[in-house]
Amino acid sequence: MSVKGKVFKYGDNVDTDVIIPARYLNTSDANELAAHCMEDIDVDFVKNVKSGDIIVANKNFGCGSSREHAPLAIKTAGVSCVIASTFARIFYRNAINIGLPILECDEAVKNIDAGDELEVDFSTGLIKNLTKSQEYQGEAFPEFMQKIIDNDGLIGYIRNR
């Protein structure tokens, strides 16, 4: 599976409280969550994000409170994947469980800028920066995790077994 999209770039320690602020956690409606995705760190994110776009961030993306709402808001907003130097472990698992592809690749993060267009192949972990004609090698998912992503998350994976 591969995706192509424009980059929205963020720094270190983007926590779940800025991905989806706690004031919106009284709903589990994915569309309502998506309407407020990233608003405390990027007020124009929801207005500017297009289906297929990609979030790139530095280290420890998704730190803070353990909330499945955070990757769900990102995915429902139209983001096709998140690339970071590192992810908070609980966010990493929550993202996989809801079917949001994520890749760790420090080299890519250091060289990618906001607005760059990327193409990402999850089966190989290859990240192509189409704007700069550069390629970076991220770590591909193990086969069982790729199957979860391919089935739109853990629930879809279990249903289709």
Swiss-Prot record:
Phylogenetic placement of the source organism: Bacteria, Bacillati, Bacillota, Clostridia, Eubacteriales
Description of how the protein assembles with itself and partners: Heterodimer of LeuC and LeuD.
Domain of life, source organism: Bacteria
Similarity comment: family membership: Belongs to the LeuD family. LeuD type 2 subfamily.
Disulfide partners: none
Pathway note: Amino-acid biosynthesis; L-leucine biosynthesis; L-leucine from 3-methyl-2-oxobutanoate: step 2/4
Keywords: Amino-acid biosynthesis, Branched-chain amino acid biosynthesis, Leucine biosynthesis, Lyase
HAMAP family the UniProt entry points to: LeuD_type2
Function: Catalyzes the isomerization between 2-isopropylmalate and 3-isopropylmalate, via the formation of 2-isopropylmaleate.
GO biological process, one term: L-leucine biosynthetic process
GO molecular function term, any single one: 3-isopropylmalate dehydratase activity
Protein name, UniProt field: 3-isopropylmalate dehydratase small subunit
EC numbers on record: 4.2.1.33
Top EC group: lyase
NCBIfam families cross-referenced by the UniProt entry: leud, LEUD_arch
Catalytic activity: (2R,3S)-3-isopropylmalate = (2S)-2-isopropylmalate
Pfam families: Aconitase_C
Gene giving rise to this polypeptide: leuD
